[in-house]
Amino acid sequence: MSYAYLFKYIIIGDTGVGKSCLLLQFTDKRFQPVHDLTIGVEFGARMITIDNKPIKLQIWDTAGQESFRSITRSYYRGAAGALLVYDITRRETFNHLASWLEDARQHANANMTIMLIGNKCDLAHRRAVSTEEGEQFAKEHGLIFMEASAKTAQNVEEAFIKTAATIYKKIQDGVFDVSNESYGIKVGYGGIPGPSGGRDGSTSQGGGCCG
Amino acid sequence: MSMEASELQDLSDDADYAASQQQGSASMMRSDSGKRSSPSEHEDAELIYLKDNVAIHPTQFASERISGRLKLTKQDSVLFLSWIPYKGQTSNAKLSEKDRSLYTITAVPFTEVRSIRRHTPTLGWQYVIVVLSSGLAFPPLYFYNGGVREFLAIVKQHVFLARSSEDPNVFIVNDFQSPLQRTLSSLELPSSLPVASGQSVYPLDGGSSNENQGRTSADIGNRVSSVIQSGLRKHKNHDPTRDLSIHLLEKFSLVTKFARDTTTQLFSENNGFGSVDKRWNNQPVHSYPEKLSNIAEEKHNEIRHSYSENDLLKDEEISNDIDVPADPLEFNNISLVWGKPRQPPMGHKEFTALLDSEGRVVESKALRERVFYGGIEHQLRREVWPFLLGYYAYDSTYAEREYLRSVKRMEYATLKQQWQSISPEQAKRFTKYRERKGLIDKDVVRTDRAFEYYEGDDNLHVNSMRDILLTYSFYNFDLGYCQGMSDYLSPILFVMEDESESFWCFVALMERLGPNFNRDQNGMHTQLFALSKLVELLDTPLHNYFKQNDCLNYFFCFRWILIQFKREFEYEKTMQLWEVMWTHYLSEHFHLYVCVAVLKRCRSKIMGEQMDFDTLLKFINELSGHIDLDSTVRDAEALCICAGENGAASIPPGTPPSLPLDDGTLYPQEDDVL
């Protein structure tokens, strides 16, 4: 399928916060509580529409365990957006946000759009991090913030799309040189013609994952 | 001392632990480090610093060190680091010239250095670890006469050094911008590295270059240029040996053996293998050892073993306008050597025939060979895996094994009791335990739950898995628990069907593969480095491609190596592959040859589609479930034979899954390092 733009996303955060479930909810619209833990990285993709333009999101779902950080860091390269996820029922996953953010700031493009997601908001009775704390952290660090639930799908669609909309706006505002793929954006057919406007290698090799 | 750092998740966070691991596994080198033109050998390079008696420990024994001279030189305002081993002063006969040249660091520019980690313990030798932008690192450089501080001070005079905020012993190189805008070059993103275009590059072992090699390279260089000028892709048409190589069909059956006997020798005789391409990165062309061409010609008429079962690995989609460099081990699309056809799995009768009357394995090699070529019938795995994993000794009798099992059962119960006896009150004050238990609880319910044996709520096998992993994290508290371990344990428990037996088999496996789970990922980096060396040896054009496309860190093979292809094959196939690898029949590092085999199968697609790192990673990920096991194992066997001694020499000593040389302790004592 052709797209105007392709955005590379990366999903980061502690192990078990629901990164893979968020991805699956977004790409397949289903919640699968039983799935294998992520080793290395997994990929997902979906087409969305912003401003009447088809945009393909290529999403990298990373392993969360501390030991794999040195590998995970190599995945940040060329990401246009990041979903930084914590689990509202586990305080420590919130406490580790600063270190994830530090990684992202160090290894990703400075213009990368970061969405902070407090996941598992369906488990409000076990809440260990208040919404205000999430908001406050996001504000302090210039992130977009949402609480979401991969289980009920609440705000999942919104989180991915709002991130894309922010990136799209940055393109409109000329923040990115879209011909430079290190920003995590590829211009496809129908996108703003740039020096490399014809470059659309991913449509043919994307495999079956963009359904 | 680390216990007070409550933020840290695991005891293996300890820098000391990491360091001790790093020492033990002989660590890494940058594969292309030796191939740059060496400014230190030029007249105009300015010598900045020279330090004698700086050594590398290829094994965990300091007595087996390789001593050499560390130098900093400067040319065109770029600082270079080199370390050259002394000639003929190896302290141990086990270490050959080859080892020494393997470790040589030839003029690495600091633009490619990401960080320097220093270790200046009060006891023992000081050392530094130089980490490159690619994420790879050189093995620790031990300063036998001290002077790490002085070394760093001098480096600091010439490049920008900034102390890492995370670790005061780590100095980030070229970290000259604000934290938000650090240059790619100072981090792990090699994309911004300067490319030494137009420079001649030399083979890694150029440090020990001899006249013969120089001549060979020159000859080949001439031939290459003429081929390139004529625009021919299949340079083999120029190979005069081609016309001589019509051979009789009856020789076909000898090809494999012939190749086995000759390739190693050929490869070492003809150093031109691989060295040619490095001069012509965009148009790699190869010189073929004469006899190999003959083999290829013979095979031309042979029925090719069919492995192109799935489309993912087929080459046909490659557009014609991209000139994919030919595979040096192929001739007219027919691989030069190939492995034996797979045999049916070994059954009970056959196994029993390999035992003496009291149950000893008469000849372990015969058993390992049999398993290597055919695997094991499932019902028999429970009896054979403990041998392969090293839990049972091959020369043990039935009675001895029975006794071992009962002793180990009690020992397991004792170990398990250690965490089972932790009261809720005690757990409150035991963060490390709670964290580990929490992680394990979360992960066992995310391991192979689609597989019948582990599916459903309150599955007893899942509980066993949790108990084994938690017990292991007490048995080996330093290593603890890391994701990926449950992937190894799952088939073991499924095969052994007994908690204690599974635990001890897992323990035996972790003796070899524990370094995969080191917090600093050193065991992984060592293997990825060895893989890069093997690809360089067995498919230089592909190696060059990875080099040009910033893929030399081989992170795209991370999952393959971390859990030995567990996620790439279906359950039964994974068990087949594991038992083949665990025989260590042709090589302890057979899994790396499996990696090469798969990569070579995809080489045309990778290069033809000009995959960058991201695309390649995604592509490799999506191979999962699409790799044919039997043909891959055959390819890997052929590659392993083909690489011969040169292959073995490409893999640094101590690379997992090699057992630690010191049988006494699983992990080197801290005192060795501190």
From Swiss-Prot, chain A:
InterPro entries: P-loop_NTPase, Rab_GTPases_membrane_traffic, Small_GTP-bd, Small_GTPase. The modification N-acetylserine is found at residue 2. One of its GO terms (cellular component) is plant-type vacuole. Keywords: Acetylation, Cell membrane, GTP-binding, Lipoprotein, Membrane, Nucleotide-binding, Prenylation, Protein transport, Transport. CDD domains: Rab2. A lipid is attached at residues 209-210 (S-geranylgeranyl cysteine). One of its GO terms (biological process) is protein transport. One of its GO terms (molecular function) is GTPase activity. GTP binds at residues 13-21, 61-65, 119-122, 149-151. Signal peptide: none annotated. It is a lipid-anchor. It comes from the Eukaryota. Intracellular vesicle trafficking and protein transport. This is Ras-related protein RABB1c. It comes from Arabidopsis thaliana (Mouse-ear cress).
